[in-house]
Regions:
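Conserved N-terminal beta-strand and adjoining loop/helix that marks the start
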Residues: 1-22, 43, 76
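Generic C-terminal helix-cap and adjacent flexible tail
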Residues: 2-5, 133-139
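Active-site-adjacent beta-strand/loop module that shapes the phosphate/pyrophosphate-binding cleft
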Residues: 8, 17, 75-99, 109
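Conserved Nudix-box catalytic region and its N-terminal flanking loop in Nudix hydrolases
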Residues: 21-60
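A short coil-to-beta-strand element that immediately follows conserved catalytic motifs
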Residues: 65-75
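NUDIX/MutT-family hydrolases
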Residues: 90-92, 100-132
Length: 139
């Protein structure tokens, strides 16, 4: 059975600092699902690799420079959403250059994996919470 839903390709990062904190960004006002917390990233443009898209998006959104060689594949999300089907590879990144700032006016927070349940997130991100807790063996 084929679906008439559009396939949306997104690439996202789980940024982890030296203290094993995870960066969450809040979706800005005026964007779909505004106010929810998510892992930074964005849409993959035609002809662009997921890694190239992610390095571009992290610079555009957070003003940090990442190298494709420093992206470690973690998992992916394949989610049938209301109006589209989401396919999103996620990468763990522990190395970047620059100071993180929300260039689109979004708020961001460094949190422990044990705190992930306290932040409202888009439905496709929810299955990542236990995986991240297990990875970081948080609290």
């Amino acid at each position: 059975m084929t679906s008439s839903k559009k396939l949306v390709l997104v690439s996202a990062a789980i940024l982890i600092d030296e203290q094993q904190n995870i960066l969450l960004a809040q979706r800005p006002k005026g964007k779909p699902q505004e106010g929810l917390w998510e892992f930074p990233g964005g849409k993959i443009e035609p002809g662009e690799s997921p890694e190239k898209a992610l390095t571009r998006e992290l610079f555009e959104e957070l003003n940090i420079i990442t190298q494709e060689k420093d992206l470690s594949p973690f998992t992916f999300i394949s989610e049938d959403c209301e109006r589209f089907h989401l396919l999103m590879p996620l990468y763990i990144i522990k190395k970047w250059k620059g100071t993180i700032e929300g260039k689109e006016g979004q708020e961001f927070r460094w949190i422990r994996a044990s705190e992930l349940d306290s932040y409202p997130m888009p439905k496709p991100d929810l299955p990542l919470i236990p995986k991240l807790k297990a990875l970081l063996q948080s609290d």
